[in-house]
Amino acid sequence: MSYQVSVAVVGATGYVGVELVRLLLAHPMVKIRYLCATQSTGKLLSSSYFHISQNYISISVSSFDDIDLDKLDVVFLCLPHGASSEIVKKIHNVVKVIDLSADFRIKDPDIYKQWYGVHYCPDLIKDFVYGLTEIYYEDIQKSSFIACPGCYPTSVLIPLFPLLRLRLVKSNNIIVDAKSGVSGAGRSVKQDNLFCEVYDAIKSYKVSNHRHIPEIEQELCFAACREDINLQFVPNLIPVKRGMMSNIYLELEVGVSLTDVREALLLFYRDSFFVVVDEEKAITTRSVVGTNYCYLGIFPGRLPNTIVIISVIDNLLKGAAGQAVQNFNVMMSYEEKLALSNIPYF
């Protein structure tokens, strides 16, 4: 066995954290040295998650303040915004960091403040590479600090980034109707997320005011080489555990056809293992739940010169923990799909 990378998962008891632990347990090049959380300290992870048996991992959950950074190579942060940046201040000179919060995704501290509040270490934002793996692969290879994208941005940017970069669709009339499983709201107890509140209902929330909007717009502006892109974005909570579907409505540039768009996406992602253009599989989240895949379908719109793109991912995997492991593999020069070759759940 080659040298195993020693890692800590901070925020290991949340939905994303425990998914990350599950993936890392199957990674042949990883040794999980610490599991950290503010709750369940001193307990095994199996006490909260029965599918993570103590036969797989017998490490008790500890406080972050009790870990020895000198024993670590990489720290994964699965924390709420604000909490990650406080820890990064303490560790950025010591270990590699893969952050799954929003703290280092937005490059402009003023925009971050507008949507999230005061940033605790704005001077470190520039050190982080935005971890949309298929777009920033080479930058991730060279970096020690990765800011993993949010789930909604991942599902939207994978199809839109190349289309705006290639000027195939208009940038002034982008509409996104996105739907997420309840796990996207996190594990904390909230009345709106209780079974009786979400079962048998679909709920729109934070209409045109979701915190992922500036993250998406930032990357679209970069793709299109302009600074004035705004999109209509409506997120919806659907009564399923996991899975995400984004329906994206676009107007084509003059002279561009649906075939041009489809061929452009096929060409752009020809070497990307986890992005597949497949209309049949893109119309259901069953194609991706339990995997790190993103399936894209391109369909004609009802109005002239319009198209509809459907993008499906697992919000906990390609939208969070899976993409974090994908970035880890790229950062460490491992095979990109290592520990990620799952087939979908039924």
From Swiss-Prot:
SUPFAM superfamilies: Glyceraldehyde-3-phosphate dehydrogenase-like, C-terminal domain, NAD(P)-binding Rossmann-fold domains. The active site is at residue 151. Its main location: cytoplasm. GO terms for molecular function: N-acetyl-gamma-glutamyl-phosphate reductase activity; NAD binding; NADP+ binding. It is found in: Cytoplasm. Its EC number is 1.2.1.38. InterPro entries: AGPR_AS, AGPR_type-1, NAD(P)-bd_dom_sf, NAGSA_dehydrogenase, Semialdehyde_DH_NAD-bd. It catalyses: N-acetyl-L-glutamate 5-semialdehyde + phosphate + NADP(+) = N-acetyl-L-glutamyl 5-phosphate + NADPH + H(+). One of its GO terms (biological process) is L-arginine biosynthetic process. It holds the Pfam family Semialdhyde_dh. Keywords: Amino-acid biosynthesis, Arginine biosynthesis, Cytoplasm, NADP, Oxidoreductase. GO terms for cellular component: cytoplasm. Pathway: Amino-acid biosynthesis; L-arginine biosynthesis; N(2)-acetyl-L-ornithine from L-glutamate: step 3/4. Transmembrane segments: none annotated. HAMAP family: ArgC_type1. Belongs to the NAGSA dehydrogenase family. Type 1 subfamily. Catalyzes the NADPH-dependent reduction of N-acetyl-5-glutamyl phosphate to yield N-acetyl-L-glutamate 5-semialdehyde. This is N-acetyl-gamma-glutamyl-phosphate reductase. It comes from Ehrlichia canis (strain Jake). The lineage of its organism: Bacteria, Pseudomonadati, Pseudomonadota, Alphaproteobacteria, Rickettsiales. The gene is argC.
